[in-house]
């Protein structure tokens, strides 16, 4: 009966059944070396989801949290995992699954950074890397393993990733993982875990396939919904530039380059082909840009992200696949060369620019065909996208 509520909630939203909040990290009874790591990482106070979800996870409940990127969800489960593992035991105690390699690596970085003062090992188990390296790393018994479903499933099947000591199983962006066709592997992984494993599931949307996972594999879960209005479109100035024809976007972008000094920017296009085309065109006009999309191999993508993070490349042109995996603190400007094909991706793209109160600017190139989509986005996020003012340079 408990899950009845899940079925009839409007627009794929879950209904919260838990509303206790703890509004400072100090009050969460965390290990002192973990608390030190949290503050050293730069967190000052918990975000909305952290205030609600960390405690029930630490207390051992199964938890479903509905939240988008940019809400601090990665740190929510990273902190909870680090609090719960026994650093003296050299075996995998927490398994975290993510839909893309980039996101898995980003999660690994957060776990390692927050766990900096604890004696923990966290291994990223992802496709596109050497299987032999994975086997070796897993034999050392890292307490936390984060990975993509395909490779994790493979390592469990080959008995290199042992599941008998696992206490926690975290599924991040569950909607994305299931929509990418990982359902079978995820179900298999569930079957191979100890019965007592605690399950934490995070998802921006709650379609039927995600709800099925929650009913099949979770016990009386705590449900937490972080509403859209708590997301980080706050502090992000959103503008549009009306572009009469698609062909004129390139000149518009060049003009924009002349007007503003860009510290770091991400430009989103809707297709891989367009990313390559735009990169060539801008390079031909002597702009320094780097590009990234799903056709590239892992080593290339890693190198490009590294250059972008370090600031040696300033402008990154990317597709939506990477909107969820790019977390660069200095991004001051996001340009939607193409408006996203679905409104949910809008927040994944621009919610980066001003994460956790950092200010950012988003500029949308809008042709006559895009006006309807822009209105939909405004309505969906209860936000206003204004025409770009002349003095935009002062805002970035």
Curated annotation (Swiss-Prot):
Name of the protein in its database record: ATP-dependent RNA helicase eIF4A
Extent of the signal sequence: none
Tagged with keyword Chaperone: no
Domain Helicase ATP-binding: 54-224
Keywords: ATP-binding, Cytoplasm, Helicase, Hydrolase, Initiation factor, Nucleotide-binding, Protein biosynthesis, RNA-binding
Localisation per UniProt entry: Cytoplasm
Pfam families in alphabetical order: DEAD, Helicase_C
Organism: Pyricularia oryzae (strain 70-15 / ATCC MYA-4617 / FGSC 8958)
Subunit (UniProt): Component of the eIF4F complex, which composition varies with external and internal environmental conditions. It is composed of at least eIF4A, eIF4E and eIF4G.
PROSITE patterns the record matches: DEAD_ATP_HELICASE (PS00039), HELICASE_ATP_BIND_1 (PS51192), HELICASE_CTER (PS51194), Q_MOTIF (PS51195)
Gene: TIF1
Residue positions of motif DEAD box: 172-175
Reaction(s) catalysed by this chain's protein: ATP + H2O = ADP + phosphate + H(+)
Residues annotated for ATP binding in this entry: 67-74
Catalytic activity, EC: 3.6.4.13
